[in-house]
Amino acid sequence: MTNKISRNGLTLMVNFSVIALCLALSLNMFVTGLPQKIFYLVSYLSVASILYGVARRRVDFKENGFYLALFAVLIIFALIRLFWAIHVKGIDTAPSTDAMTNIGNYLLGAKRLLLGAFVLLSLAIYGHRVSTTTLRIGRGLILVGLLITLGFGIHEHLYTENIRIKLTTEAASMSSYMILFIYCAWLWLSRFETHAYWKVADVVVLAVTFALLYLCGTRVTLIAMIAVGLLFLVQTYRLSLLTNWRISALLVGVLAVLILMTSNRWVEGMQDIENYGSNSSTSLGARVAIWGGAVNFIEHHGGGFATPDARTTEARQFIMAHYPLNVEGYTNVKYNMHNEFLEVTTLQGWLGTLSLALIYLTVLTGVLKKCDLRGVALPMLGLFIAGLTDSVMPYNQTATIFMMALALCCIRRPLPVRRVTTA
């Protein structure tokens, strides 16, 4: 009797956690504070569920080997960031305002990465207990949240000075990454649905996500959204994609529409490349200058721990020496290195680089060993693409949303007997 009550309680807790995470994702882009509190509650429940499973010997380490490995490397990644933030906070006696913001983001982000790793492991182990009703409620919350977010985004675009919407974040790029990760969670949860009306919801969410990313004006997230969507289609409908010309034609048509609707941003990018010799103070030129400053900093500091102010000072000296007219790069280098690996290496050294590489290597190893990680691949692909031209994880908001989406993408349960396909 006691065991039955425990199992029912565990099932209830896991289903509550999924709904709570979806609620947090749905609120995150227009409400501040509450989504983070929900995340903390779910993380504490997740820690308790894992301890319960270990104590009762109900954790199958062999079956969950990949997710245990992913949990371990995420813990290592978070601990290195946490140790760096505490260390730098102690030795930097007079940090600038930007440095304090940077350190604070890393410190809070590292704590949430640690807690998020437990949420991920809990849903990976107990995801089979999640009911179809729970998934439908969760997807409904995300759908409503995205629609409300679009309303706030349109209002901000029309009635404020922000041409690129920021919503609840400090930068448009941060908002776009968070929206991308929310879309990844939606895609994975849609895999377990059979009813045709949810396919209409899939189209609505695709359109809303695209509209939000368009309003954010971040090119790389549009590329990432297309890549993530293609990966999901290949995972889910690969036979139809190969054999059904109508689905293939529809896919090509959607891609063409997306490219045409964002053509102005691609034209700007091409103009930046063409005019780079005469005007390097552009979005592209700034990145080239910042990357050069980052590489120069790494070469001179041997890949050890460094303070944000030291990095900014030396990178600006490099930019002034090699790109004296690049005002954009000189200004923005104080925020981050606009590349995930360069960002980590310049601050946490080669130890930080290794911890980030371990996450990708773990996923790659799982792919080679044919582990069931199709859900995990979606946000990881989005993070990798976005991280090529920007720093995503230093900001505590994006790190939190990434971990929530990644955790939801770890849910594994039997696929429905009948799936909706196009004949």
Where are these regions (language model features)?
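Transmembrane signal-anchor hairpin modules in multi-pass inner-membrane enzymes, especially those
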Residues: M1-T93, A124, H128-R136, R191-V200, ...
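Transmembrane alpha-helices of multi-pass inner-membrane enzymes
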Residues: I359, A377-L388, V392-A423
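Hydrophobic transmembrane alpha-helices and their immediate junctions
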Residues: T243-R246, L347-L381
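Aromatic-anchored transmembrane helix interface
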Residues: F66-L82, I91-I125, G140, L146, ...
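A membrane-periplasm/extracellular boundary helix in multi-pass inner-membrane enzymes
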Residues: L215, T236-S278, G292-E299
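Alpha-helical transmembrane segments of multi-pass inner-membrane proteins
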Residues: L115-E161, T169-Y237, M261
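Transmembrane-embedded, aromatic-rich helix segments that form part
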Residues: K37-L41, R219-L231, G352-A357
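Long extracytoplasmic/lumenal interhelical loops at the membrane interface
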Residues: S281-G285, F305-Q348
